[in-house]
Amino acid sequence: AAKPAPAADAAQPAAPDSQAAAGPVAKPAADGPAQADPLAESRSYEGALALFRGAKYTDAIAGFKNFLKTYPASTLAANAQYWIGYSYYALKDYKTSLAHQQKLVATYPDSPKVPDALLNVATNQIELDDMAAARKTLKDLVAKHPSTPAAKLAARRLAAIK
């Protein structure tokens, strides 16, 4: 798919790639209070993702929050957090979206979703007319994750909002 022009980019959150969004399913923890069911875990995540893809954002948020409550140690937890933030963005609730994307960065600092989450943080800051914070977030993203697609988009957005 073609990328939108840089000016149009500024109003869009990072578009996740479907393979990265799905990710691997976590293995059950042998020492946990109860054995996780990998199939149930996958169904829970995929069900919430299907709601998001169907533009049922409020239901998707509930589904992803339930997923995080049920499977807090899942390898998909960061992705679920990402989709919660993205869903709030789709609902134009930029403050809540911002908080959830920042939570992803703080809670899952080593997740491959961090660069996209930072791009979404900046996108929400732009929507909230906090250009100074958006510039700082974009600069930090480029500096900390320079080889990522999100950093390349961040550099274009940074040039567009200077």
Predicted regions and their residues:
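Acidic, proline-/serine-/threonine-rich low-complexity intrinsically disordered segments
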Residues: 1-47, 51-52
